[in-house]
Amino acid sequence: MKTAKTQPDDRAARVALCKVGEPMDPTIATLVQERGTVGAWRAIATNADGAYDRFAARVSDLDLARVLHAADRLGIRVLVPGDPGWPRGLDDLELAPLCLWVRGCVDLAAVLARSVSVVGARLATAYGESVAGEIAHDLAVRRFAVVSGGAYGIDTAAHRGALAGDGVTIAAMAGGVDRLYPAGNHDLLEEIARTGAVVSECPPGASPQRHRFLARNRLIAAMTPGTVVVEAGIRSGSLNTARNAERLHRVVAAVPGPVTSTASVGTNELIRQGIASLVTDAAECAELFGELGADLAPRVEGAPAVGDDLPEVPRRVLEALPVRRSSTVDQLTRSAGLSVGDVLGGLGALEMRGLAARSPDGWRRAG
């Protein structure tokens, strides 16, 4: 590295460590904790006793000024802890990212203060994509930013739904923000970068790899106050996101699916284990993730049944009245467990309401 002998500041040291290491690297994390970012970088760059040989090739190739210049040319900015736009939720992670690479002009800290992560299976069903899109759209209308991972399936539906609701959506990448992945979502991710943000802890040029996806999932969980899993099989990576959210004491929700669908086994299990609250729409998500008492979902109630508003005696007489045949007053006293006077009074009230009718053989329900 051409700048190995310089004395970098915290920001430069974080960028350098990010370039030579991997997300959640335990060696770098320990060094930063013990020596600070500048001391950690100095130890790795000098490699005095050969303890950090595994970083040597990347250290040798690193030209920090060139990295930062290339990022600036591509419209990529670097956020570090303490910056005004730094997502404060990331500080809750045991292995927090050294820095965040961002394409997009939104103030991340501001939009993430009222946000929801919407995640789920890549191989989603039509049901899952429809529900994810509708939830994300309606959350955006309610001024929630929607965070997801940019993948096919539920992630795509969530991003598109938020955009359709004229909202802000943020895509967290498992590779560099200059290598938008998957390729089939390139145009969508470009639109997200223009209107919201595409973010990653991996530096520009980094390719998406499996371990980076797992590391990325913890960012999705940490950045927002809550995560909703729309559809997930039993081995879906979105379950990893949900469990990260639970460990971080974030609110977790899941949309139930058909018990016959393998695509919903994971979400149903999250609900069964008590990890996730059951939600069915954006209103219920907003109630969970929004300000206490400010985003209440309407109660779901069925249509009132005939006679629900009646006093007790007429209601008991109505319940005792047959539908297809008539009944005498004596029979009604036995069926309803009431006196003759109560039955006659109840029948009179029901007749006035059009709920009971006289017949040659006694009384029956009207209609």
Residue spans for each PLM region:
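Short, small/acidic-rich helices and loops at N termini and domain boundaries
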Residues: 1-87, 353-362, 366-367
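Glycine-biased, small-residue-rich flexible motifs in mid-sequence functional cores and linkers
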Residues: 1-9, 74, 78-367
